[in-house]
Amino acid sequence: MHKNGISGHRIGYMNYLKNMRFLLQAITLLISVTTIGQKQRPNIIYMMSDDHGYQAISAYGYDLNKTPHIDKLAEEGVLFHRAFVTNSICGPSRAVMLTGKHSHINGFKDNHSTFDGSQQTVSKLFKNAGYQTAVVGKWHLVSEPQGFDYWNIVPGQGDYYNPDFIENGIRKRVPGYVTNLTTDFAINWLEKRDKSKPFFLIYQQKAPHRNWMPEPKYYHLFDSIQFPVPDNFFDDYKTRSSAATKQEMEIATDMHYAYDLKLAFDISEEQRKGLAGSWHSIFNRMTSSEKQIYKEAYQPSIDVFSKANLSGEQLAIWKYQRYMREYLRCVQSVDDNVGRLMDYLKANNLDKNTIVIYTSDQGFYLGEHGWFDKRWMYEESFRTPLIVKGPGIAKGKQTYSMVQNLDFAETLLHLAGLPIPTDMQGKSFVPVLKGKKGGHDALYYHFYENQEHRVAKHIGIRTARYKLIWFYELNEWELYDLETDKREMHNLYGKKEFAAIENMMKAQLSSLQQRYKDNTSPQLLR
C-alpha cells in the first residue's frame, strides 16, 4: 500500500493512462503537422537545357540575344554567377544531378557509359516521400528512367524535327518541333497528374545541342545581325599546355559543312568525312512541305556563300556568324517554352508554391578560344547558368557564391524539407537562396572522355581566385589567376613567383581527391 493509501497497482495504471494520453496527443500533433506539411510542401520543376551557355542568357549581361522569360526567373529569384559542373559533358552531368555524387562514384563517367538506374537517385527519394514524379525531354543516360511515375523522353540525343519519343517504354514518332513538344508533354502531365500530391518534374530540353536546327518561325531571326567576334577567337594556344593544340573543336577547321553549317545540298565534303548520312537522316525527318520551307530559307545564303569563295580568317568568321545564328535561334525557342510553362503555372495557381530551377547540363563555347562544344575546365564550359525562384527564396538577387551541380540533389531535397542521404557528396546551397553565406571555397573537376573532339582527360581545382588543371595522361599542368586573366590566356604554371600558389593548389587538389574518393594518380600531386 502506498503511503497515501493508493495501491502501487493503481498508481501504475494511472501512469499508464497518463502516458497513453500524451502518446495520443503526440500522434495527433504529428498527423496534424504532417497534413499541413503535405499541403505546404513545394512543387519543384527542374528545367535543364542542353549546352545552353550563360553567354546566351541576357540576364547575365551579355548582348548576344534576348531571353525575356528566363530573365524573368532571375528577376523573381536568385541568379548564380559562379555555378559550375563536375564533368562538362551531357550524360555525366545528368547523372551527377540525379545522384548527388561524382562521376567515378555514380559510374557514369562519359557519354559511352550506361547509367545504373538501380542506385539511389533524387527522383526515387521524392517519390518515396509522396511526391508525384515525372521526367520529359532529353534523358541521355541509355538505361530507362527509374523513380518516375511518368516519363516521356527522346532516345539518345533526340531529333529537332518530328522526333521520336519514348513514353513509359513505348516509342513513337511525334510530328512537330522537339522544344515545343517537350513542353506540350510537360503541361499535359501537369494537367493529368494526381493533384492531391506535390509534384517533382524534371523538364529537359534537347536544344540548343549540336547541330542547332531552328524552329521554322525563327529561320530568319538574326539574319541582319553581325555578332561581335570574341577577342581570343584566333587563339594560337602558345601559352597553354599541348592539350589545347590537340583538340578538334575549332569553328574554323572542325565544323562540318552540311551537318553544322547547313551548306547542304552539295555535300561532297561531308561524304569525304563520312557524315553525309548523318545530315540526310536529320533532313529526311521533315515532310516534303517542311523541306521546301527549309530550302527556301537556306538556299539564298548557300548561294551567296558559294559565290564568295572565302578562305582563311574570312571563312572562319563566316562560319562563326552562321554558327551563332543557328545556336541562338534554337535558344529563342527554349526561352519561349520557359514562358509557356511559367504561364501555365500562373494560370493554374501553381506559381506561388512551385520552386523553379533553370540551368544547363554545362556551359558552351560561343567562339571563345575559337571553339564550339564544351568538355574543358576553362570557364566557358565549366561554368553553367543557374537561376532559382520560388517560395522562401530571395527575389532579384545575384550571387557570386561558388556552387556545383553536385549540390543540386541535396538542395532540392532541402527545399522540400526531405532528409538528405549521408552518402551524397554535395552541399545544399539553400542558405545562399535565402540571402545568407554558403557555397564552396574550392571545387573539384574531372573530365574522362577524349574520343570525340580529342580533349585530353584532366582534373582540376578552382578557388575564388585561382584555377589549377592537370592533364594527367600528358602530365602537363596549367595555372590561372582568374582575377587578372579572366580569359585564361596566360598559363602561370612553372613560373618561380607562383611556386607557393602551385604548392597550395596542389595540396588542396589532393585534399579534394581524398574527400571525394577519387584515386587518379594521387602520387603525381606531391
Regions inferred by a protein language model and the residue ranges of each:
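Formylglycine-dependent sulfatase
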Residues: 17, 35-472, 476-477, 486-526
